Amino acid sequence: MKILILKPSSLGDVIQALPVLRLLKQHYSAAEIFWWIDTALAPLLEGDPDLAGIVRFERRRWGKLQHWPEMLRSIRWLREQNFDLVIDLQCLARSGAFAWLARGKLLVGLDEAREGACGFYDLAVPRASFHTHAVDWYLAVLPPLGVPVHKDFIWLPERPQLAAEIKRKGVAAGARLILLQPGARWKNKRWPAKHFAALAGRLAQKHPDARFGILGDRGDHPLGEVIAQAAPERSLNLCGATSLPEMIEWIRRCDLLITNDTGPMHVAAALGRPLVALFGPTEPRRTGPYGQLQNVLHLDLPCSPCLKSECHYEKPEECLRGLSPATVLGKIDTFRLKPPSDQPI
């Protein structure tokens, strides 16, 4: 049996879709499963034990005429695979078209698909309610296929070879590690850097044995520098300094992640690591940290969640600016922060 899953982006969305892969492989142990993914996120799935291969997709290149021959070769390859099942979890016109062009025997998607993608599907799976979490909605494609849904699976398999990198950075076994994620794709999903810095300073005072790591991409490096100054001798600005697999292992190793609504938040939820998630314009019941919604902080404003990437409230971005460091610290105080002595280094 051959199966193709289409979920090219983003990081958080791909993480939330991984349970579909895990349960398909458990049910169809001999199946060859392929994943269609954005080239930038391919390292997330490279070497995954449940995949027979990944199909790289580079949206910006394929939108240009000179790259059409490459696109046609990919389509030809997809057709040659003779997939028995194609599952489109991206549900946009592009992914729906590629799913249809793969000519699988059965094409399944989600019934809230945008841009007319539903027209490509043999079966469109409804969302149970507006507030149904993305993970549960993705998993809803499985029962119609005869695949049971349960939680007995490893979401993100460990990569022990990367643990040495953490040790090289100076975080020894048994040390308490607190990670902070100040960036986000939407500007209005970012808790202010000055708030992160103030929080880090308070945490450094309360936990003198703690080390701090600031996660993010290269563009977040200035934010990381601001935050690191709160405890300069105990902070590592990791923004732009880790690969995607390395970032995952840093989160696996941490005692606590303090994060905006972004990809690393979903990584921590998948790994079962303690987190505090700061939400503003988005709806945590739909896309919050799965299994840890009780650890979400957000303000109950008339406009929130607006689900918009730009703020139009009379007090700009008040949904996050109004969350004080003291409020976040109070939430953190409810955790019993213990060094993860059972975490391999």
Predicted regions and their residues:
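Catalytic machinery of carbohydrate-active enzymes
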Residues: 1-345
